[in-house]
Amino acid sequence: MVFISETSDDGSNGGDPTKNPQEEEEENLPPIPQGIPDELIESTVLLIRRCHYPTLSLLSKTFRRVISSSELYKSRFILNLTDSVLYALIGFSPYNTTNLYILNCNIPRNISLHLREIKSLPPLNHGSAVVTIGYHMYVIGGHNRLHQPTSNVSIIDLRFHTSCSLPRMQRTRVYAAAGVIDGRIYVIGGCVKRNDHWIEVFDIENRIWSSVPHHRYCNGSSLRGEGFVTSVVMQNKIYILDSLFGFAYEPRHGTLQSLGFETQFMFLWRDPCCVIEGLLYCIDPMCVLGHAIVVYDPNELIWRRVKGAYILPKFCYYQCKMANFGGKLAILGCSNSSQRGLKDVWFVEIELENRQSGEIWGKVDSLAIVLRSVKSPSIDLFRSVTF
């Protein structure tokens, strides 16, 4: 009987009798890469919702590096893969400081919405003015912990919830008006005495504050130099509301115009308010036009009611805040809880429809209790950021 071996004279192991075929096969495999290329990680991370980035950053240093790169956010913007996130400044008695909370609505519908305090950030000054540019939030002035007005300015990187200090303003300010026009931050008032530093402008690129000494006050201007109730940016002007009057500051011409009660604009302008697609939305508790939500068209100079079968929670309208949430109207407000001794913070998301007739209709897209507390919360700010 003859036995035929399947092993040739060369040997399938390369002629090395000390190696078996399995070891030889493993040696011939291509080398395993030591790490995943950044380009591959970025192309994958781009498709993932930003609310998951904090978890992804824990996987490795490479993931953290990619998620922290500005190139990732530029790519998200170019590919229209940005997310809108809501932030709120909320304080509790005695209201000396406020904390920043995040409300992420880009989650599956089966998960409850919840305001989450960002504990990596220090408490922020009560009465500070806040503006956002991209993923940066600028916190300007306000009362410090000793309840004294401050000129401090800080910037928050909303990608990673970190903050750092910026150069101080030339004056201390509380409840100042602030707005971004032509890439520059204008800060108005918030201080009792009016002088050449009453309006300051911040150069974002060079990080330099400058006063605007040559602003001209138009007839009827009655600014008392106190803190303001609210302000919005519309048609390249900063509209300012105090307890008695309204004003419009136009940086390009350096004019500050008074808006008297006789003007149509002042008829229903209240806080809370926000601007969506060039229109000013407000809550009118008296429902003068038949609905609680009204809208002002600065081109037609007319107020209209926002129609629709929407029902708002029974909260104190004057203590609410509104925000432009990706073209939708977002409202954050407080009410007494069904549980005795507790306070509820409600979130309302209203989808807006601009019909051909010029009418605007609203439909509640989301309604939820997002925070419950034994203390009475004070909502200083409600702002949407998209990046």
UniProtKB/Swiss-Prot annotation:
Residues 1-34 are annotated as: Disordered. It comes from the Eukaryota. Kelch repeats lie at residues 136-183, 184-231. Residues 31-78 form the F-box domain. Keywords: Kelch repeat, Leucine-rich repeat, Repeat. The keyword DNA-binding does not apply. LRR repeats lie at residues 105-128, 196-219. It holds the Pfam family F-box. InterPro entries: F-box/kelch-repeat_ARATH, F-box_dom, Kelch-typ_b-propeller, Kelch_1. The keyword Transcription does not apply. This is F-box/LRR-repeat/kelch-repeat protein At2g29770.
